[in-house]
Amino acid sequence: MGKMQYYTVKDYVELLEKRGMLLENRVEGEEDHVIRNLTYNSKEAGADTMFICKGAAFKMTYLREAVERGAVCYISEKTFDLEQQVPCILVKDIREAMSVLANFFYNRPWENLVVTGIGGTKGKSTSAYYMKAVVDDYMEALGKKESAVISSIDIYDGKSLVESHITTPEAVELQQHLRNALDCGI
């Protein structure tokens, strides 16, 4: 389990290069900067952030806001012409890269959790909550914490209970919730 480890921009570049995802590395001068936040939401950007430019509806104003809030670099499928030069990492497929980056950033939390996935067209949330109830009763009998759940209804990760807004969380949120569950001893 252990405390979360943070990595440098160079570590992320090397990871993407090793996976064959890197198109271009334009992070001169920021290679040793430690990344402590990974997000695609400009409102969540702050100091030491690697900002992910993703989606068909992505606007350059999001990147500008992230940089104003402290993002040290961005990752994208293309470069953006900003007023100031911002280090960037260019990748072939931003969605694939985002999942690899999130897994790395959150230190692969799933490796230390028991994870069950439920698929199908009907009854996934119902099945998940039945399963959670059974597991929680068992855990309570052992004097242990209740289980986490990620569903289309809500998400409980030991740290917070929030309403779910989409059926499947993005890779960054998914790994964050798994990390929270791990850190909370679930």
Language-model regions, residue ranges each:
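N-terminal leader/targeting and accessory segments in enzymes
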Residues: 1-100
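Phosphate-binding loop of NTP-binding sites
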Residues: 97-186
